[in-house]
């Protein structure tokens, strides 16, 4: 028990240290620093079970991610990302990991993969927590959130690449997105254990 408690304390310290250290360092100018910190955080997250994560008090949130196009975002074990209209789907239960003020990573509870965006703006599931898996979470005026890549954007206009789902639930490439499009607007919805099938409750450690 003491060892587990030490992991939590260390993780909490690492995340707060990461936040303060990042404060005056532009992400684009510090790839080595950011990669090192993400590796440290990922290692500590992997030591605990999903049940243990409940002790992290706001650092990690378990949510569904609902898009204005009518779909919940899912991360599948084979690394594909898609949307579903099914509420509380197995692969739509996600963990939101707060890395710093306004910076998050998103991981599928069942798949264990992190949401990532590559240089072409394509969404995918990553086994490792890398810079492609860090997004800037912004609260918009219409009460929805947007999630922008911290690594990729249009070189000419500086317009950011956003996480987005099309009207058919397919992922929309980041280079085709704009902040005020409904494709890019999401609501993090809380998970209701009573709506999960019994098998899923055991899988996600809900009793």
Curated annotation (Swiss-Prot):
The Gene Ontology CC terms held by the record are:
cytoplasm; extracellular region; extracellular space
Read off the InterPro entries from this record.
Answer: Fibroblast_GF_fam, IL1/FGF
Indicate where this protein is primarily found.
secreted
A single BP term in Gene Ontology: response to temperature stimulus
**Molecular function (GO) terms listed?**
fibroblast growth factor receptor binding; growth factor activity
Record keyword Phosphoprotein present: yes
Using the UniProt annotation, give the residues that carry a glycan (glycosylation sites).
78
Q: Where in the cell is it found?
A: Secreted
Q: Which residues carry this modification: Phosphoserine?
A: 111
Q: Which keywords does UniProt give here?
A: Disease variant, Glycoprotein, Growth factor, Phosphoprotein, Secreted
| Role description | Plays an important role in the regulation of embryonic development, cell proliferation and cell differentiation, and is required for normal cardiomyocyte proliferation and heart development.
* Protein family according to the UniProt entry: Belongs to the heparin-binding growth factors family.
User: By its UniProt entry, which PANTHER family does this protein fall under?
Assistant: FIBROBLAST GROWTH FACTOR
Associated disorder is: Metacarpal 4-5 fusion: A rare congenital malformation of the hand characterized by the partial or complete fusion of the fourth and fifth metacarpals. The anomaly occurs as an isolated trait or part of a syndrome.
Q: How does it assemble?
A: Interacts with FGFR1 and FGFR2.
What's the protein name?
Fibroblast growth factor 16
